[in-house]
């Protein structure tokens, strides 16, 4: 473990929408340091969402992130030779990073032709409480509910 808490790096808002969350999302989508390609994918996904729905792309994005943020998760804890899945609350920074990770993973697993289409469809699904990313959150909640009896092992 580290001696001190890691300093939180300042993140610049993205140039089009001025959102720090979207910048984090762009960085998560990025492969091999190709940020301009990642930006192109995300902004074209936003255009697809805006052309399809009644909401703007950024509104749908923010709603999807809020719907996917987990409030509770399970962590493994060894007690006397047995490993228990202990439900714990999730800190806000981790909520955001989990939501972003789940959205990116779910959109990469979809079957549409381009990544922008996959991302747009996953964001629209997540904003309406559907899709694989939302299913991942529900599974996490189900695990926490099933292991509620071990909540007193929290640390």
UniProtKB/Swiss-Prot annotation:
Which molecular function GO terms apply here?
rRNA binding; structural constituent of ribosome; tRNA binding
Gene Ontology annotations for the cellular component aspect, listed alphabetically: small ribosomal subunit
Ranges that cross the membrane: none
Q: Which GO terms describe its biological process?
A: translation
InterPro entries hit by this protein: Ribosomal_uS7 (IPR000235), Ribosomal_uS7_bac/org-type (IPR005717), Ribosomal_uS7_CS (IPR020606), Ribosomal_uS7_dom (IPR023798), Ribosomal_uS7_dom_sf (IPR036823)
Q: Which SUPFAM superfamilies match?
A: Ribosomal protein S7
Look up the domain of life of the source: Bacteria
> What's one Pfam family the UniProt record gives for this protein?
Ribosomal_S7
Record bears the keyword Ribosomal protein = yes
Give the keywords, sorted. Answer: Ribonucleoprotein, Ribosomal protein, RNA-binding, rRNA-binding, tRNA-binding
Q: Which family does it belong to?
A: Belongs to the universal ribosomal protein uS7 family.
Q: How does it assemble?
A: Part of the 30S ribosomal subunit. Contacts proteins S9 and S11.
**Could you tell me what this protein does?**
One of the primary rRNA binding proteins, it binds directly to 16S rRNA where it nucleates assembly of the head domain of the 30S subunit. Is located at the subunit interface close to the decoding center, probably blocks exit of the E-site tRNA.
The entry's protein name is Small ribosomal subunit protein uS7
Native organism is Sulfurimonas denitrificans (strain ATCC 33889 / DSM 1251)
User: What gene is this protein a product of?
Assistant: rpsG
């Amino acid at each position: 473990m580290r001696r001190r808490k890691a300093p939180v790096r300042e993140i610049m808002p993205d140039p089009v929408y001025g959102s720090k969350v979207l910048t984090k999302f762009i960085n998560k989508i990025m492969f091999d340091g190709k940020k301009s390609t990642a930006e192109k994918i995300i902004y074209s996904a936003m255009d697809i969402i805006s052309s399809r729905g009644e909401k703007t792309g950024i509104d749908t994005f923010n709603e999807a992130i809020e719907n996917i943020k987990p409030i509770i998760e399970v962590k493994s804890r060894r007690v006397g030779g047995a490993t228990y899945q202990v439900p714990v609350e999730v800190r806000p920074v981790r909520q955001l990073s989990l939501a972003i990770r789940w959205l990116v993973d779910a959109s990469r697993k979809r079957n549409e032709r381009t990544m922008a289409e996959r991302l747009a469809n996953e964001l629209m699904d997540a904003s309406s409480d559907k899709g694989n990313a939302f299913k991942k959150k529900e599974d996490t909640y189900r695990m926490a509910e099933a292991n509620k009896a071990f909540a007193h092992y929290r640390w």
